[in-house]
Amino acid sequence: MTSRMDARFAQLKSEGRSAFVTFVMGGDPDPETSLAIVKALPQAGADIIEIGMPFTDPMADGPSIQAAGLRALKAGMTLRKTLQLVRSFREGDAATPIVLMGYYNPIYIYGVDKFLDDAKSAGVDGLIIVDLPPEEDDELCIPALKAGLNFIRLATPTTDDKRLPAVLANTSGFVYYVSITGITGAAAADSSAVGSAVARIKRHTALPVCVGFGIRTPETARAIAAHADGAVVGTALVDALKASLDAEGRATAKTVNAVADLAAALAQGVRGAQQAAE
């Protein structure tokens, strides 16, 4: 049976376009608003949705996503509730792939086997766990693959040809190329450097390569999508959400649309790469 992820990339390939991949923090600014945002994203043009699992010590994340995680935790978000968020989303959307992104500790505490069973039954398609290197694949990666979940690995500008085969060995779904070194949201992506980096990764794998970190505008999204199988946007969407909150950090009537409207503009940027190529 074809996975949701493979089906989505096959569909995109047949349409001659790159994926628009969105990241939002699960439970930010509260579980109910978060579900409304996730439901709005496919209508805005998101092809794949990454949902952050809030964690108290998010070392790879910049200030925006760290703050989003803290807002979610303050609103009572847990890993169990994140899985429930996916389950609720799946009631109305059976096609859009969902990837959970975060850190190993909450999964370890939840229990790996139980987490994988619950994630699969909730309708999760893949995992990105930023603090588990390939040397620790037996912890979660191999069990996840056996459970039928994609395990998506990060590659960076410092991942050289010697290291790349280890990074790619058990990766499935897609490869997430981090276009800048450092934390999320720190700088703008350089589309010219991305092209050669994606080509280098593709010499080692047939998997789609999606590029993230530093994409904030439709123009940058378009430039990146011209070189990659997907463009990932997170910090810009999280910032749009934050700007819509009231003084106490609570959702307003504008919050869902603030995220969806920016997502729609970015989706147009990604689709513009296809038009430019034709």
Swiss-Prot record:
The active site is at E50, D61. CDD domains: Tryptophan_synthase_alpha. GO terms for molecular function: tryptophan synthase activity. Keywords: Amino-acid biosynthesis, Aromatic amino acid biosynthesis, Lyase, Tryptophan biosynthesis. The keyword Nucleotidyltransferase does not apply. Pathway: Amino-acid biosynthesis; L-tryptophan biosynthesis; L-tryptophan from chorismate: step 5/5. It catalyses: (1S,2R)-1-C-(indol-3-yl)glycerol 3-phosphate + L-serine = D-glyceraldehyde 3-phosphate + L-tryptophan + H2O. It comes from the Bacteria. Its EC number is 4.2.1.20. GO terms for cellular component: cytosol. Signal peptide: none annotated. Belongs to the TrpA family. Tetramer of two alpha and two beta chains. The alpha subunit is responsible for the aldol cleavage of indoleglycerol phosphate to indole and glyceraldehyde 3-phosphate. This is Tryptophan synthase alpha chain. It comes from Bradyrhizobium sp. (strain ORS 278).
